[in-house]
Regions:
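Short aromatic/hydrophobic contact patches that present stacked aromatics
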Residues: 8, 57, 194
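HotDog/MaoC-like acyl-thioester-processing domains
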Residues: 3, 55, 59-69, 73-140, ...
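Acidic/His-leaning functional-site neighborhoods
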Residues: 148, 154-236
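Hot-dog-fold acyl-thioester-processing enzymes
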Residues: 1-53, 100-102, 109-189
């Protein structure tokens, strides 16, 4: 089952160039995933578990402009053990494909946080589609940079917290953007990027964002107070 929804590219969805930003794109993905879930009886208002994001990989071919409408398609591609794969396709008003993305998720008990094993019933519920735009449904782990050029500290404020009572996945991309050197940011947002989530962050915690550059792009690692990795963001050149 391919779930389809239209989105309006509003002012708050755009960067300085008045095209869709990466953070807005992730919010579109987050919303259509929850819409699909609600459509098949998997609404967080009705079930005793939550879907938690493990990783994203996005490839933007072209960015839609402000005041346009886009069509987003999403489907469950595969289920294995405790992990599920969801893919996305974004189309412009002319029907041209302008972005592909893949994501991996786990399902946890809403009260205990314990991982739940996923079976064929989940694949049937979501009407899994085997097709995909990526070779594998499973996103490989990122390698941490050996040296960091910049480090900044941030507090987890209330506006970072979502319905799962921890820092929302999109906020990690916001923090990664904030730690990028101005010269890097001025070149424009990366059209190919990956995010891996390692551990939840909570209100009142202090996080350290570490930026490092390499031959293929830049990496930002978000760490907790004990130096434990919370998330990794890789921007390709």
């Amino acid at each position: 089952m391919v779930y389809t929804e239209q989105f309006y590219v509003g002012y708050s969805d755009c960067g300085a160039d008045m095209t869709l930003s990466n953070t807005a794109l992730l919010r579109y993905f987050e919303n259509i995933a929850s819409m699909h879930g609600a459509a098949v009886g998997d609404s967080p208002l009705e079930v005793p578990y939550r879907w938690v994001l493990l990783s994203y990989h996005e490839c933007v071919l072209r960015r839609p402009k402000f005041n346009s409408r886009v069509t987003l398609k999403s489907w469950n591609r595969a289920v294995k053990g405790v992990t599920s794969c969801r893919e996305f396709e974004l189309y412009d008003e002319g029907g041209d494909l302008i972005c592909t993305a893949i994501s991996n998720w786990v399902r946890v008990d809403a009260e205990t946080g314990k991982l739940q094993r996923l079976g064929e019933a989940v694949a049937e519920q979501y009407g899994s589609e085997a097709r995909g735009n990526f070779d594998s449904p499973w996103i490989p782990k990122l390698k941490e940079a050996a040296v960091y050029d910049v480090e900044k500290r941030y507090m987890v404020e209330r506006n970072f917290i979502d319905a799962n009572r921890h820092m929302n996945n999109v906020c990690y991309l916001d923090l990664a953007n904030c730690v990028l050197p101005q010269a890097v940011w001025d070149k424009g947002e990366s059209n190919t990027f990956s995010i891996h989530y390692r551990k939840a962050s909570y209100y009142g915690e202090e996080l350290t964002c570490c930026y490092g550059s390499g031959e293929t792009g830049a990496t930002v690692v978000v760490k907790g107070g004990e130096g434990d990795v919370r998330a990794e963001v890789a921007f390709e050149r």
